[in-house]
């Protein structure tokens, strides 16, 4: 019984030693506060990953399906600063786009941005009807051309913002419609594979 009480007391004391750290989004997402995390040592905050939605950052309720992942890379005092690690669309949102008699076209592309960041970008488009394999290939080729071109032209921050805000997907939809009417195009996932040496 005494041992159990000691364990409870020790746990309480350990919790008392913990401090709350404020987590901030990367500067190119406005550097806004995105959460709090407890730790008894600032080193334990390093590399923690926080998931937020684009709605949390912008206040735009139509962006609740866009999930963003930020990783802590620096701690100063009670402030924890993050870098972008990836994004993905909520599964429920993707399911809502794919209906009977539609065609989902997926593309996965490994790219390097103008400033040397390596990313895996997953795009998708939804055609209004069942389409031919040749049309799928043509739309996938459009995805590839647009995403590769953007990677050559844009630095990491601008590429991520254009992807997250739907600008790249809008270009894919516009060009893809020349092959077949599309219900929607989306960048559904981004993963950071590597950073330039000096980053």
Swiss-Prot record:
GO CC terms in record: ribonucleoprotein complex; ribosome
One GO molecular-function entry: structural constituent of ribosome
GO BP terms in the entry: translation
Family: Belongs to the eukaryotic ribosomal protein eS1 family.
Gene for this chain: rps3ae
SMART domains, sorted: Ribosomal_S3Ae (SM01397)
Protein name according to UniProt: Small ribosomal subunit protein eS1
Matching PROSITE patterns: RIBOSOMAL_S3AE
HAMAP family registered for this protein in UniProt: Ribosomal_eS1
Pfam families recorded: Ribosomal_S3Ae (PF01015)
Keywords for this protein: Ribonucleoprotein, Ribosomal protein
